[in-house]
């Protein structure tokens, strides 16, 4: 049963799943993901894993020095990429980055250079400190400066400098905040999200240029934080892994990817809504990715429609 539900599908098989049985298939996979406790679990190890399940947390955040602002506790876990170990750090249950000394300590000690933030609230009304006209602030031994803000229609890019007062050193960090909340219904939203993923990866690669090719661990992990919906951070990582799997193997298995992430994080339950969004974005990826298929004519037509749509509504094109 495990092999059947978690086996890889070729990209053509996956993209042809849009049929009368599509929702039934997705619901079955979703139940399987939520009721499987361990990645690559077998009936023989199921009982043992339930009793000895571990979490691959970055560190015990609660063991860090207490913050002057009171409680400063949250969970953070490494998540492997498709072919890169510890590519992401997923942050959970963090209420405020500004008031969290431990958050910036995590950023500093893991050598993070790219931060991705989601907020399910209306970002225009959000009181997030980076939206304000505050150019710098201090938390513990860390000084954080906003050097440049680049606003786009559906995301904001902020260049930060974080300085450590204890050793006098500083680091440049690129902070992305995604403003849209794709539901997978519109191909344009899916295309934008995929473009955003590719841009974040490019930014990380720029920081990793000097990394040794023999080192299979990310030198500068991407920190992903989602306010109000922890699952969105998980979806970001899952989509990145799935899209890389499609590029490299021309096949994909969403259940396998989520189960592996589940074994690395604090995730116990993944909503059907979020699982459906991942699958719909991947279904639309046939037009957003640069892949050679028999539908190349349709791909060209789709991209032309997207450009026209963006011109009419004065939005930035993803192509």
From Swiss-Prot:
Pfam families: Y_phosphatase (PF00102)
Listed InterPro entries: Prot-tyrosine_phosphatase-like, Protein-Tyr_Phosphatase, PTP_cat, Tyr_Pase_cat
SUPFAM superfamilies: (Phosphotyrosine protein) phosphatases II
GO MF: protein tyrosine phosphatase activity
Entry-linked CDD domains: PTPc (cd00047)
Domain of life: Viruses
Residues in Tyrosine-protein phosphatase domain copies: 7-285
Family the UniProt entry places it in: Belongs to the protein-tyrosine phosphatase family.
PANTHER family referenced in this protein's UniProt entry, alphabetically: RECEPTOR-TYPE TYROSINE-PROTEIN PHOSPHATASE, TYROSINE-PROTEIN PHOSPHATASE 1
Protein name: Tyrosine phosphatase-like protein N3
Organism: Microplitis demolitor bracovirus (isolate Webb) (MdBV)
Organism taxonomic ancestry: Viruses, Viruses incertae sedis, Polydnaviriformidae, Bracoviriform, Microplitis demolitor bracovirus
């Amino acid at each position: 049963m495990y092999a059947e539900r978690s086996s890889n599908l070729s990209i053509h098989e996956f993209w042809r799943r849009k049929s009368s049985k599509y929702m039934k298939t997705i619901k079955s996979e979703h139940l399987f993901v939520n009721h499987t406790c361990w990645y690559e679990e077998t009936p023989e190890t199921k009982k043992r894993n339930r009793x000895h399940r571990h979490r691959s947390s970055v560190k015990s955040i609660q063991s860090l020095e207490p913050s002057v602002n009171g409680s400063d506790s949250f969970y953070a876990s490494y998540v492997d990429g498709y072919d890169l170990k510890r590519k992401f750090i997923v942050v959970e249950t963090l209420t405020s980055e500004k008031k969290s000394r431990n958050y910036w300590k995590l950023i500093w000690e893991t050598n993070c250079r790219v931060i991705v933030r989601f907020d399910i609230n209306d970002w225009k009304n959000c009181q997030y400190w980076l939206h304000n006209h505050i150019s710098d602030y201090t938390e513990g031994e860390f000084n954080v400066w906003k050097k440049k803000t680049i606003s786009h229609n559906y995301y904001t890019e902020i260049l930060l400098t974080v300085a450590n007062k204890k050793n006098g050193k500083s680091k440049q960090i690129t902070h992305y905040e995604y403003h849209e909340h794709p539901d997978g219904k519109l191909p344009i939203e899916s295309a934008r999200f995929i473009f955003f993923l590719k841009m974040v990866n490019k930014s990380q690669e720029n920081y990793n240029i000097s990394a040794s090719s023999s080192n299979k661990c990310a030198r500068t992990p991407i920190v992903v934080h989602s306010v109000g919906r922890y699952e969105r951070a998980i979806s970001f990582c899952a989509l990145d892994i799935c899209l890389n799997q499609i590029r490299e193997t021309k096949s994909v298995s969403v259940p396998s990817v989520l189960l592996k992430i589940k074994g690395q994080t604090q995730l116990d339950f993944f909503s059907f809504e979020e699982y459906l969004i991942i699958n719909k974005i991947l279904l639309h990826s046939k037009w957003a990715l640069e892949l050679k298929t028999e539908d190349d004519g349709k791909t060209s037509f789709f991209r032309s429609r997207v450009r026209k749509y963006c011109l009419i509504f004065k939005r930035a094109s993803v192509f």
